[in-house]
Amino acid sequence: MEHLPQAGGALTTLSAQQARTVAALAARIFPSDDLGIGAPEAGVIFYIDRSLGGALAELLPRYEEGLDALDAYGTAHHASSFAELDPAIQDDVLRAMETEAGIPGFGASGSRSFLRLVIRHTREGMFCDPAYGGNRGTLGWRLLGFPGVQRSFTAEEQMGEPIVREHIGTMADMNFRYDPSGHAKRDGTGE
């Protein structure tokens, strides 16, 4: 399965099985298209993993509970963990999660709420600055036609024609780096 993280990857928070499940979820939420642009290529799993170890650490228990419930459901109903299921069956499981009744094992918040959380984080991972672990190679920004981080635009650039640049700027180009607290820090300034 191409969307699963490779052994020895830069995962820091989730277990290998949890990461496989998140990667499979993200791949169904934002699947790869004919151009090869989707959650797997954009590295969404690495954004989610990094965020759960930093700015979103309070959500880690919810993820652990939800991922365990999802794998337990897959094993009980389809004899495989979620990540190992055929994509069509994965889609059926996601549709069941979306219903009001949902699927069991997700605690008080339910499977629908958990799925919405993962959808939100998948979107963030697709379109965040690459410094946060997702949007690898600025694929998400390229998909949207977003020109990237810029110091400023001239009045002429803001009028009429779309802004087209060969290089899509990132926070790294502006001397910013990722901070585990979830905030960008300017290198060498303490800001």
Predicted features, each with a name:
Residues 2-39:
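Immediate post-signal-peptide N-terminus of mature secreted/exported proteins
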Residues 5-7, 18-24, 43-191:
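Mature-region segments of soluble proteins
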